[in-house]
Each structure stands twice: as structure tokens, then as C-alpha cells.
Amino acid sequence: MAGWPTGVAAVTLFVEDVAVAKEFYERVFGLPVHYADDVSAVYAFGGTLINLLARSEAAELIDPAPVGTSGARMQLTVAVEDVDALCAELTGRGVTLLNGPMDRPWGPRTAAFSDPDGHVWEIAH
């Protein structure tokens, strides 16, 4: 198929409180803000932008689909060199792990945690 995308440009996560989400992402990921206004904050995460958007603004992007409330409906996985070391660093930053570190039957060593709005992040090697 000609012109098929070669990467994900941005992921938009709908959040209840942009300030709370910003504090979490800056503390946990240590990323500088790429762009911010009253209803959003954008971070450059490798080659992908992570956009934290106030849930109140989400309908404009996805209408006519309904805006979901809460709960894990997807997981974002980030490749890391040392899952155990990063887990120790994350817990030192106040992050509660959902699971792991553990060796998965299909090969990788993983651990997972969620942000204040329930978006699940997995680290894997």
C-alpha cells in the first residue's frame, strides 16, 4: 500500500485535570513541555508527541464517537534497557506499579503503571 504511515506522530490522552496530569508526566518521565495552554500539555516522547488534553475538549476531536470516561482501554509500551532499574527509579518518584517486574511467557521482561487518569504504561525489555 503506497504511502502507508511509518510511525505514530502523536497520541492524545484525555485527562480530567491537565495540571495534575502535567505534574505526573513531568515528575515520572522528566520531559520538558513542548507546548501547553489551558486545556492541554504536549510532550515530545522520542519521535512521538504525547498530548494531554482536557476531557472536556475531546468531543471536538472524535465527534460523533462518545468520549469515554475512565478505565484502561489500551496500554502504551515503551522499550527500555533495564526494567528492574527503571522500576526502582519509578517507585522512588512515587509511582505505584500495577505489576512487575516480571518475565512474560512470550519473552519480554515487563512492568506496568498507570497515570492519574488510568492510562496504562508498560515498560519492556
PLM regions: where:
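Conserved active-site tyrosine of GNAT-family acetyltransferases
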Residues: 21-25, 90, 118
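Vicinal oxygen chelate
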Residues: 1-9, 31-78, 87-114, 125
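Polyanion-binding surface elements
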Residues: 12
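Short, conserved charged micro-motifs
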Residues: 20, 82-87
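Amphipathic alpha-helical segments
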Residues: 17-32
